[in-house]
A protein has these predicted regions:
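C-terminal motif of bacterial Sec signal peptides marking the signal peptidase cleavage site
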Residues: 18-21
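Bacterial N-terminal signal peptides that target proteins for export
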Residues: 1-11
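Bacterial signal peptide processing site
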Residues: 23-25
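A mature extracytoplasmic/lumenal domain signature
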Residues: 65, 78-80, 93-97, 117-119, ...
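A short, structured loop/turn motif at beta-sheet edges
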Residues: 54-56, 79-89, 116-121
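C-terminal partner/receptor-binding element of secreted or periplasmic proteins
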Residues: 39, 107-144
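An anionic, turn-rich surface loop/hairpin at beta-sheet edges
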Residues: 89-119
Length: 144
């Protein structure tokens, strides 16, 4: 009787092992990949030219970051300014993964920022991601 009961137990054990083999892997920690592999061509300028509908000077920042796949969304978020005159500004690069499956190919991705600023002159801009400095822009010209 015990021998007859053994095959269903073995079958249940085999089925549970097969199902656990189908479990998904935990999402990979891409580490610095979420901040990109490399970045380049960072530029910033202040447009202080007067005009209709303008509420003051506008700060523009552009750059390019190599991301691990196509479809990443990159956003610059303004942080604190230091107390020097002219001030230095800090920005944090926020990244958002693409949804669904994507091709695994390093993709240069453009970053753009354009917002009104209260500063007519800026000494430097430091861009960080994941707590590390990604880029420092020392030359921020002003267009009058």
């Amino acid at each position: 009787m015990r021998i007859a009961a053994l095959p269903p137990v073995i079958g249940a054990l085999a089925a549970s092992l097969a199902l656990t083999a189908c479990a998904t892997y935990p999402e990979e920690d891409t580490g610095s990949a979420s901040c990109g592999y490399d970045s380049r061509d960072w530029k910033a300028w202040v447009n202080a030219m007067p005009g209709p509908g303008r509420n003051g000077p506008t700060l523009y920042i552009t750059g390019e970051v190599d991301m691990p796949t196509p479809g990443w969304s990159l956003t610059l978020v303004e942080g604190p300014a230091d107390r020097m005159q002219p001030p230095g500004l800090r920005f944090r690069l926020e990244t958002e993964r693409p949804g669904g499956m994507t091709t695994q190919v390093i993709t240069p991705t453009e970053v753009r920022y354009a917002q009104t600023t209260r500063y007519h002159e800026i000494r430097e801009i430091i861009i960080t991601c994941g707590g590390e400095a990604l880029a420092t822009i020392d030359d921020v010209p002003v267009a009058h």
